[in-house]
Swiss-Prot record:
It comes from Vibrio parahaemolyticus serotype O3:K6 (strain RIMD 2210633). Residues 4-234 form the ABC transporter domain. Gene3D superfamilies: 2.40.50.100, Nucleic acid-binding proteins, P-loop containing nucleotide triphosphate hydrolases. It is an enzyme of class 7 (translocase). PROSITE patterns: ABC_TRANSPORTER_1 (PS00211), ABC_TRANSPORTER_2 (PS50893), MALK (PS51245). Its EC number is 7.5.2.1. This is Maltose/maltodextrin import ATP-binding protein MalK. Part of the ABC transporter complex MalEFGK involved in maltose/maltodextrin import. Responsible for energy coupling to the transport system. It catalyses: D-maltose(out) + ATP + H2O = D-maltose(in) + ADP + phosphate + H(+).
Amino acid sequence: MASVTLKNVCKAYGDVLISKNVDLQIDEGEFVVFVGPSGCGKSTLLRCIAGLEDITSGDLYIGDQRMNDVEPSKRGVGMVFQSYALYPHLNLYDNMSFGLKLAKADKAEIDKRVEHAAEILQLGHLLERQPKALSGGQRQRVAIGRTLVSQPNVFLLDEPLSNLDAALRVNMRAQITKLQRQLGCTMIYVTHDQVEAMTMADKIVVLDGGYVSQVGKPLELYHYPQNRFVAGFIGSPKMNFMSVFIDEVESERVKVQLSNGVSFWIPVDGTTVNRGDRMSLGIRPEHLLSATEADATIHGEVMIVEKLGNETQVYLNLEGADADVIYRQPDTLAVDTGDKLEIGIPAHRCHLFHSDGRACKRLFKENGVDFE
């Protein structure tokens, strides 16, 4: 195990800056997920840590050693790619042991490591098979096993589940999480799927346009996003946003007015808000309520109804909203397309964002989150 430290790291291709002033501390044994949309620089940053890309400026440390100019093979990292990159003519044993054989490791040591990795990954009965005889999930486990036998200080995984179908992805993310907990290893995992990030990570790093937008525990990012980008990216379905007018301001609460004229107080830090400002109110679909239980109500026309059995998702056309408002209830809801529906907004669940995307600090204490 080893810690990973990035100090003001930048990566550029010519005049195009991809990773921008990244400062990050990853502790020994921590499971960290880099998440963000396509093109945000998450895979580039991972490749810089691996040594597959040169760092343009800044410093990278693995443990106490500066690694900027150290060869990839000497950094003590192991990488699993999106593609399995298995040798099709070799069986599983030979695929997993290939790197050790190149390093001229002792035969007994190779056998010991491969057998141990195969036991952990439940591949022991498949070691004589070739990759073509395996399922996608089994192939991905072989790719992980090949990295595991090298006993790296840091595991790097670049979107390893994106080639798998939805059901297998759920199973594999649980297996990878279990493996990391079992080994206690430092693991950095790249994905564009925020559900993977939320379910697997000790700590999430949200990237946007090459910058680190926010770093924190999954529930911290979910309940207390520092900006509108993180609020909209973390959570599925994503947060609803609607335009509001600021009626009154106090130090620990702000009174907002919806497009329908309804006003109510939100418990947020009001020290950066001015009366008369135009701001964005955010509310998650699962936090909306029936109209009788809330501090404020909104009316909309039902555009789409998704009945999933255990829950219902309703898409409402609403004046003042940036897009259709999604209302999510953990039950079957008796509503159809074209109906008029009134739903409620609980003030303590609301988020408030400035026009530049900055969030006002929420003052409501959510369960399971360290609150400062």
